[in-house]
Amino acid sequence: MKHVKAVIFDWAGTVVDYGSLAPMGAFVETFGQFGVPITIDEARGPMGMAKRPHIAALMALPRVAQAWTDKYGHAPDDADIDAVYDVFVPKNIAVAASYSSVIPGVADVASALRGDDIRIGTTTGYTREIMAEIVPGAAAQGFSPDSIVCTGDTAEGRPSPYMIYRTLPELGVWRAKEAIKVDDTEVGIEEGINGGTWTVGVSVSGNAFGMAEGDVKALAPDEFAWRRNAAIQKLQAAGAHYVIDSVADLMPVVYDIEARLARGERP
Protein backbone atom coordinates (compact mmCIF):
# COMPACT_ATOMS: atom_id res chain seq x y z
CA MET A 1 0.00 0.00 0.00
CA LYS A 2 1.40 3.39 -0.96
CA HIS A 3 0.09 5.76 1.72
CA VAL A 4 -0.92 3.78 4.81
CA LYS A 5 2.35 2.54 6.31
CA ALA A 6 1.39 1.26 9.76
CA VAL A 7 -1.48 0.15 11.96
CA ILE A 8 -0.98 0.43 15.72
CA PHE A 9 -3.27 -1.76 17.80
CA ASP A 10 -4.16 -1.74 21.46
CA TRP A 11 -4.13 -5.20 23.07
CA ALA A 12 -6.91 -6.11 25.55
CA GLY A 13 -10.34 -5.71 23.99
CA THR A 14 -8.84 -4.93 20.59
CA VAL A 15 -6.71 -7.91 19.54
CA VAL A 16 -7.03 -10.24 22.56
CA ASP A 17 -9.45 -10.74 25.47
CA TYR A 18 -12.87 -10.17 23.93
CA GLY A 19 -14.73 -7.77 26.22
CA SER A 20 -11.51 -6.66 27.97
CA LEU A 21 -12.33 -8.86 30.95
CA ALA A 22 -8.90 -9.70 32.41
CA PRO A 23 -8.30 -6.54 34.46
CA MET A 24 -11.83 -6.25 35.79
CA GLY A 25 -11.79 -9.12 38.25
CA ALA A 26 -8.32 -8.11 39.41
CA PHE A 27 -9.43 -4.54 40.13
CA VAL A 28 -12.61 -5.60 41.92
CA GLU A 29 -10.81 -8.28 43.94
CA THR A 30 -7.99 -5.91 44.91
CA PHE A 31 -10.23 -3.13 46.17
CA GLY A 32 -12.35 -5.69 47.98
CA GLN A 33 -9.21 -6.95 49.71
CA PHE A 34 -8.70 -3.42 51.04
CA GLY A 35 -12.27 -3.32 52.32
CA VAL A 36 -13.41 -0.77 49.73
CA PRO A 37 -15.59 -2.61 47.20
CA ILE A 38 -15.94 -1.22 43.68
CA THR A 39 -18.24 -2.21 40.84
CA ILE A 40 -17.29 -3.57 37.42
CA ASP A 41 -18.62 -0.37 35.81
CA GLU A 42 -16.45 1.75 38.10
CA ALA A 43 -13.43 -0.42 37.32
CA ARG A 44 -14.01 -0.01 33.57
CA GLY A 45 -14.18 3.79 33.64
CA PRO A 46 -10.46 4.62 33.25
CA MET A 47 -9.68 1.56 31.10
CA GLY A 48 -6.81 2.08 28.68
CA MET A 49 -4.69 4.07 31.11
CA ALA A 50 -1.56 2.67 32.69
CA LYS A 51 -2.61 0.65 35.70
CA ARG A 52 -1.26 2.90 38.46
CA PRO A 53 -2.98 6.02 37.03
CA HIS A 54 -6.05 3.80 36.54
CA ILE A 55 -6.02 2.98 40.25
CA ALA A 56 -5.47 6.66 41.09
CA ALA A 57 -8.49 7.57 38.95
CA LEU A 58 -10.62 4.98 40.73
CA MET A 59 -9.53 6.26 44.13
CA ALA A 60 -10.41 9.80 43.04
CA LEU A 61 -14.03 8.81 42.40
CA PRO A 62 -16.04 10.60 45.10
CA ARG A 63 -17.80 7.44 46.28
CA VAL A 64 -14.59 5.42 46.42
CA ALA A 65 -12.62 8.24 48.06
CA GLN A 66 -15.31 8.57 50.74
CA ALA A 67 -15.41 4.82 51.32
CA TRP A 68 -11.63 4.80 51.69
CA THR A 69 -11.79 7.72 54.13
CA ASP A 70 -14.48 5.97 56.14
CA LYS A 71 -12.35 2.82 56.28
CA TYR A 72 -8.92 4.31 56.99
CA GLY A 73 -9.61 7.75 58.46
CA HIS A 74 -7.93 9.69 55.68
CA ALA A 75 -8.41 10.41 51.99
CA PRO A 76 -6.43 8.11 49.69
CA ASP A 77 -2.91 9.36 49.04
CA ASP A 78 0.07 8.29 46.93
CA ALA A 79 1.14 5.67 49.47
CA ASP A 80 -2.34 4.14 49.33
CA ILE A 81 -2.28 4.11 45.53
CA ASP A 82 1.08 2.34 45.63
CA ALA A 83 -0.24 -0.20 48.13
CA VAL A 84 -3.25 -1.03 45.96
CA TYR A 85 -1.09 -1.19 42.83
CA ASP A 86 1.35 -3.58 44.49
CA VAL A 87 -1.50 -5.96 45.27
CA PHE A 88 -3.19 -5.52 41.87
CA VAL A 89 -0.24 -6.28 39.57
CA PRO A 90 0.38 -9.88 40.70
CA LYS A 91 -3.35 -10.57 40.39
CA ASN A 92 -3.39 -9.19 36.84
CA ILE A 93 -0.29 -11.17 35.90
CA ALA A 94 -1.86 -14.33 37.31
CA VAL A 95 -4.95 -14.09 35.10
CA ALA A 96 -3.43 -12.51 31.97
CA ALA A 97 -2.54 -15.74 30.17
CA SER A 98 -6.08 -17.01 30.68
CA TYR A 99 -7.38 -14.01 28.74
CA SER A 100 -4.93 -14.10 25.83
CA SER A 101 -7.29 -15.59 23.25
CA VAL A 102 -6.98 -13.66 20.01
CA ILE A 103 -10.27 -12.05 19.00
CA PRO A 104 -11.84 -13.63 15.88
CA GLY A 105 -10.65 -12.04 12.65
CA VAL A 106 -7.51 -10.47 14.11
CA ALA A 107 -5.06 -13.01 12.67
CA ASP A 108 -6.62 -12.71 9.21
CA VAL A 109 -6.44 -8.92 9.33
CA ALA A 110 -2.81 -9.04 10.45
CA SER A 111 -2.05 -11.28 7.48
CA ALA A 112 -3.90 -8.94 5.12
CA LEU A 113 -2.00 -5.92 6.44
CA ARG A 114 1.32 -7.64 5.94
CA GLY A 115 0.21 -8.63 2.45
CA ASP A 116 -0.23 -4.91 1.73
CA ASP A 117 3.22 -4.16 3.22
CA ILE A 118 1.71 -2.41 6.24
CA ARG A 119 3.68 -2.69 9.46
CA ILE A 120 1.98 -3.66 12.71
CA GLY A 121 2.66 -1.92 16.01
CA THR A 122 1.01 -2.13 19.41
CA THR A 123 0.71 -0.01 22.53
CA THR A 124 -0.81 -1.08 25.82
CA GLY A 125 -1.70 -0.01 29.33
CA TYR A 126 -0.17 -3.28 30.51
CA THR A 127 3.36 -3.56 31.88
CA ARG A 128 6.01 -5.76 30.26
CA GLU A 129 5.54 -8.31 33.05
CA ILE A 130 1.87 -8.67 32.18
CA MET A 131 2.54 -8.73 28.45
CA ALA A 132 5.04 -11.55 28.93
CA GLU A 133 2.07 -13.72 29.87
CA ILE A 134 0.05 -12.70 26.79
CA VAL A 135 2.45 -12.41 23.85
CA PRO A 136 3.39 -16.10 23.43
CA GLY A 137 -0.23 -17.24 23.33
CA ALA A 138 -1.18 -14.50 20.88
CA ALA A 139 1.74 -15.42 18.62
CA ALA A 140 0.66 -19.05 18.62
CA GLN A 141 -2.77 -17.90 17.43
CA GLY A 142 -1.42 -15.81 14.56
CA PHE A 143 -0.90 -12.35 16.01
CA SER A 144 2.72 -11.26 16.39
CA PRO A 145 3.29 -7.51 15.92
CA ASP A 146 6.47 -5.83 14.76
CA SER A 147 6.55 -3.57 17.83
CA ILE A 148 5.20 -3.67 21.40
CA VAL A 149 5.36 -0.55 23.57
CA CYS A 150 4.17 -0.97 27.15
CA THR A 151 3.36 1.13 30.17
CA GLY A 152 6.66 2.11 31.73
CA ASP A 153 8.50 2.29 28.42
CA THR A 154 7.76 6.02 28.11
CA ALA A 155 7.63 8.98 30.50
CA GLU A 156 3.83 9.03 30.38
CA GLY A 157 1.13 6.69 29.16
CA ARG A 158 -2.19 7.48 27.53
CA PRO A 159 -3.65 9.87 26.60
CA SER A 160 -0.19 11.27 25.89
CA PRO A 161 1.19 10.32 22.47
CA TYR A 162 4.54 9.15 23.80
CA MET A 163 3.91 5.46 23.09
CA ILE A 164 2.89 6.40 19.54
CA TYR A 165 6.07 8.44 19.17
CA ARG A 166 8.13 5.46 20.27
CA THR A 167 6.25 3.01 18.06
CA LEU A 168 6.50 4.94 14.78
CA PRO A 169 10.31 4.94 14.51
CA GLU A 170 10.40 1.28 15.54
CA LEU A 171 8.20 0.64 12.49
CA GLY A 172 10.24 2.91 10.22
CA VAL A 173 7.39 5.41 9.84
CA TRP A 174 7.95 9.12 10.42
CA ARG A 175 4.71 10.70 9.16
CA ALA A 176 2.03 10.08 11.78
CA LYS A 177 -0.68 10.67 9.17
CA GLU A 178 0.45 7.41 7.52
CA ALA A 179 -0.46 5.43 10.64
CA ILE A 180 -3.79 4.23 12.05
CA LYS A 181 -4.42 3.73 15.78
CA VAL A 182 -7.02 1.05 16.60
CA ASP A 183 -8.34 0.96 20.17
CA ASP A 184 -11.39 0.01 22.22
CA THR A 185 -11.01 2.76 24.87
CA GLU A 186 -11.61 6.49 24.80
CA VAL A 187 -8.18 7.24 26.23
CA GLY A 188 -6.59 5.06 23.55
CA ILE A 189 -8.40 7.01 20.84
CA GLU A 190 -7.13 10.23 22.44
CA GLU A 191 -3.61 8.77 22.33
CA GLY A 192 -3.90 8.40 18.56
CA ILE A 193 -5.38 11.85 18.05
CA ASN A 194 -2.67 13.45 20.18
CA GLY A 195 -0.09 11.51 18.19
CA GLY A 196 -1.43 12.73 14.84
CA THR A 197 -2.69 9.38 13.52
CA TRP A 198 -6.01 8.28 12.12
CA THR A 199 -8.10 6.61 14.82
CA VAL A 200 -10.46 3.64 14.67
CA GLY A 201 -12.62 2.77 17.66
CA VAL A 202 -13.60 -0.83 18.38
CA SER A 203 -17.11 -0.91 19.80
CA VAL A 204 -18.39 -4.45 20.35
CA SER A 205 -15.33 -6.59 21.16
CA GLY A 206 -13.86 -4.20 23.71
CA ASN A 207 -14.22 -2.21 26.88
CA ALA A 208 -16.92 0.12 25.60
CA PHE A 209 -19.28 -2.87 25.27
CA GLY A 210 -17.65 -4.89 28.02
CA MET A 211 -19.08 -8.37 27.54
CA ALA A 212 -17.67 -11.80 26.68
CA GLU A 213 -18.27 -12.95 23.11
CA GLY A 214 -20.75 -15.65 24.10
CA ASP A 215 -22.76 -13.19 26.18
CA VAL A 216 -22.82 -10.72 23.28
CA LYS A 217 -24.16 -13.39 20.93
CA ALA A 218 -26.87 -14.28 23.45
CA LEU A 219 -28.26 -10.73 23.62
CA ALA A 220 -31.66 -9.94 22.20
CA PRO A 221 -31.33 -7.84 19.02
CA ASP A 222 -32.77 -4.69 20.60
CA GLU A 223 -30.44 -4.88 23.62
CA PHE A 224 -27.46 -5.53 21.36
CA ALA A 225 -28.41 -2.50 19.27
CA TRP A 226 -28.63 -0.05 22.16
CA ARG A 227 -25.45 -1.35 23.80
CA ARG A 228 -23.62 -1.10 20.47
CA ASN A 229 -24.91 2.42 19.86
CA ALA A 230 -23.83 3.49 23.35
CA ALA A 231 -20.34 2.11 22.71
CA ILE A 232 -20.14 3.84 19.33
CA GLN A 233 -21.17 7.16 20.88
CA LYS A 234 -18.47 6.89 23.56
CA LEU A 235 -15.75 6.30 20.98
CA GLN A 236 -17.02 8.99 18.63
CA ALA A 237 -17.16 11.45 21.53
CA ALA A 238 -13.49 10.67 22.16
CA GLY A 239 -12.79 11.70 18.56
CA ALA A 240 -12.58 8.41 16.65
CA HIS A 241 -12.50 8.98 12.88
CA TYR A 242 -14.15 5.57 12.37
CA VAL A 243 -15.84 3.02 14.63
CA ILE A 244 -16.05 -0.70 13.81
CA ASP A 245 -17.51 -3.64 15.72
CA SER A 246 -14.20 -5.51 15.90
CA VAL A 247 -10.82 -5.68 14.20
CA ALA A 248 -12.34 -8.21 11.79
CA ASP A 249 -14.02 -5.20 10.12
CA LEU A 250 -10.84 -3.12 9.76
CA MET A 251 -9.66 -3.64 6.17
CA PRO A 252 -12.37 -1.57 4.42
CA VAL A 253 -11.42 1.31 6.74
CA VAL A 254 -7.75 0.92 5.84
CA TYR A 255 -8.61 1.12 2.14
CA ASP A 256 -10.79 4.19 2.73
CA ILE A 257 -7.98 5.94 4.61
CA GLU A 258 -5.58 5.01 1.80
CA ALA A 259 -7.91 6.74 -0.68
CA ARG A 260 -8.27 9.81 1.54
CA LEU A 261 -4.51 10.13 1.90
CA ALA A 262 -4.17 9.83 -1.87
CA ARG A 263 -6.53 12.82 -2.16
CA GLY A 264 -4.33 14.82 0.21
CA GLU A 265 -6.53 14.51 3.29
CA ARG A 266 -5.05 14.33 6.78
CA PRO A 267 -6.42 13.02 10.09
From Swiss-Prot:
Active-site residues, record numbering mapped to chain: 10, 51
GO CC, any one term: cytosol
Keywords: Hydrolase, Magnesium, Metal-binding, Schiff base
Keyword hit for Metal-binding: yes
Transmembrane regions: none
Co-factor note (free text): Binds 1 Mg(2+) ion per subunit.
Keyword Transferase in annotation: no
Catalytic reactions of this protein: phosphonoacetaldehyde + H2O = acetaldehyde + phosphate + H(+)
EC number: 3.11.1.1
Entry's Gene Ontology molecular function annotations: magnesium ion binding; phosphoglycolate phosphatase activity; phosphonoacetaldehyde hydrolase activity
Gene3D superfamilies: HAD superfamily/HAD-like, Putative phosphatase, domain 2
InterPro entries given in the database record: HAD-like_hydrolase_sf (IPR050155), HAD-like_sf (IPR036412), HAD_sf (IPR023214), PGP-like_dom2 (IPR023198), Phosphonoacetald_hydro (IPR006323)
Cofactor requirement: Mg(2+)
Pfam families listed in its UniProt record: Hydrolase
Alphabetical GO biological process terms: DNA repair; organic phosphonate catabolic process
Major enzyme class: hydrolase
Purpose of the protein: Involved in phosphonate degradation.
Homology family: Belongs to the HAD-like hydrolase superfamily. PhnX family.
Protein name per Swiss-Prot or TrEMBL: Phosphonoacetaldehyde hydrolase
Organism: Paraburkholderia xenovorans (strain LB400)
Gene name in the database record: phnX
